[in-house]
């Protein structure tokens, strides 16, 4: 048993079987109130156990999940995204959570909105296969990834695009999304200011790239 306190992870290894128990830490602040939710009925029945824990708002939960799916493109993230798209759908509230994730991320927004597609066959075979009772093939992974990218792009209206450009241009307009007091957003702005000061040409290239993606 290994307890990694700094990342809130418990790793169990017995007879060649490894189980990782992780708690997602929230350092960005909450865009809504947390709610306590019980373990789903299927898991309660499977493991004959019960627990309940506080969860971030659904919009932030899936907004962050979508940012992660666009960033690292891991099969587990895209599996969760497929379930979202097949059930709740990509709602306005989830879009709000996505935009919060975009302006809190260390990655440039244009890279998340128009990601370079990664070959994830090895990750799929070694880090996903056998984990889910619901069928999810590699072909479905690729189709879900393309669907997500298209869904995100088409969901952004002119106000959303103007907000992203204003923040990345270091003249944020908070009239649409009032994220100005969140520590992650303040940190993003500080990093952008330093980036513009230290590398003005590359900074402008990234602004132009964002404009290009938002015109697609």
Task: For the regions a language model picked out, list residue spans one by one.
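Catalytic cores of NTP-dependent nucleotidyl/adenyl transfer enzymes across multiple folds
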Residues: 3-135, 200-216
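Short glycine-rich, low-complexity/disordered patches
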Residues: 1-2, 83, 162-167
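Long, low-complexity C-terminal extensions of enzymes
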Residues: 129-216
């Amino acid at each position: 048993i290994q307890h990694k306190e700094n990342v809130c992870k418990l790793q169990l290894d017995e007879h060649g079987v490894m189980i990782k128990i992780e708690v997602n830490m929230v350092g960005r602040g909450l865009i809504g109130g947390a709610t306590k939710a019980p373990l789903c009925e299927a898991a309660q029945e499977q493991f004959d156990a019960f627990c309940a824990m506080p969860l971030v708002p659904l919009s932030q939960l899936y907004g962050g999940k979508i940012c992660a799916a666009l960033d690292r493109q891991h099969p587990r993230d895209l599996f969760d995204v497929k379930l979202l798209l097949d059930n709740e759908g990509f709602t306005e509230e989830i879009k709000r959570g996505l935009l919060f994730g975009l302006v809190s991320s260390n990655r440039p927004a244009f890279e998340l909105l128009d990601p370079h597609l990664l070959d994830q066959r090895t990750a799929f075979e070694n880090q996903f296969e056998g984990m889910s009772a619901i069928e999810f093939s590699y072909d479905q992974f690729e189709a879900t990834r393309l669907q997500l990218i298209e869904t995100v792009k088409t969901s952004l209206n002119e106000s959303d695009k103007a907000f992203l450009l204003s923040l990345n241009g270091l003249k944020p307009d908070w009239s649409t999304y009032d994220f100005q007091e969140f520590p992650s957003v303040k940190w993003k702005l500080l990093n952008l200011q330093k980036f513009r000061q230290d590398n003005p040409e590359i900074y402008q290239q990234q602004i132009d790239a964002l404009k290009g993606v938002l015109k697609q």
